[in-house]
């Protein structure tokens, strides 16, 4: 939802007189809602099945255990409504959730291949998870997302085959960008001099206000 609202704001802002010479770029930075060690400990303690790292766990059951059977339905109703308002169809809580380390590693690799490809990769991952009931830890899902985003499938496979690939860059970015962040989506909008931070799935109007504060106005 946050991604779609940002894109809507960019579509509105780019034709403006004050934005004609402005180059907008979007870069995705890492953040773990459930860090890899949480999955490792959960498997070791028996909280999660032994194959959770590769197969995931049932998404709906997990969120019920986290938020409660009474609290979850209205939360999902609000999320589904926000998705529809943003033009996203097919929202579903079916399928599995799971570790996202491999997806983060591929997103880090994708950044070097071009920000457009990284953004396309994230779009594929979000669609697979929220609309197609596919697990974020499924190797086939990740490779398909990479291919559909225009990334070299063989190179993406090499990243997945090497457990430590991209971990150094990933850790460095976590240290630089994730400190002080408690949830996602979280946006940093900057012109290189001034920075504005927005937390949550902000409406397009919120981004437009920031653009105006940066001098990108009508």
Please report, for each region that a protein language model flagged, where it lies by residue.
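C-terminal cap of thioredoxin/glutaredoxin-like
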Residues: 1-18, 24, 108-218
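Structural alpha/beta surface segment adjacent to cysteine/selenocysteine redox centers
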Residues: 3-129
């Amino acid at each position: 939802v946050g991604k779609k609202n940002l894109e809507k704001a960019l579509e509105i802002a780019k034709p403006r007189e004050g934005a004609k010479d402005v180059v907008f770029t979007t870069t995705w930075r890492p953040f773990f809602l459930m860090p890899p060690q949480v999955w490792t400990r959960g498997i070791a303690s028996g909280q999660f099945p032994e194959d959770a790292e590769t197969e995931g766990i049932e998404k709906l059951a997990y969120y019920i255990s986290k938020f409660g059977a009474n609290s979850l339905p209205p939360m999902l109703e609000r999320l589904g409504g926000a998705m529809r308002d943003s033009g996203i169809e097919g929202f579903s809580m079916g399928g599995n959730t799971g570790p996202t380390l491999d997806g983060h590693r591929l997103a880090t690799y994708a950044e070097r291949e071009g920000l457009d490809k990284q953004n396309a990769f994230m779009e594929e991952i979000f669609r697979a998870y929220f609309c197609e009931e596919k697990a974020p830890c499924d190797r086939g899902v990740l490779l398909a997302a990479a291919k559909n985003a225009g990334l070299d499938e063989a190179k993406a496979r090499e990243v997945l085959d090497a457990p430590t690939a991209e971990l150094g860059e990933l850790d460095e970015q976590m240290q630089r960008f994730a400190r002080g962040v408690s949830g996602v989506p979280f946006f940093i909008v900057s012109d290189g001099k001034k920075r504005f931070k927005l937390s949550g799935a902000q409406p397009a109007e919120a981004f437009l206000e920031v653009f105006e504060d940066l001098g990108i106005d009508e």
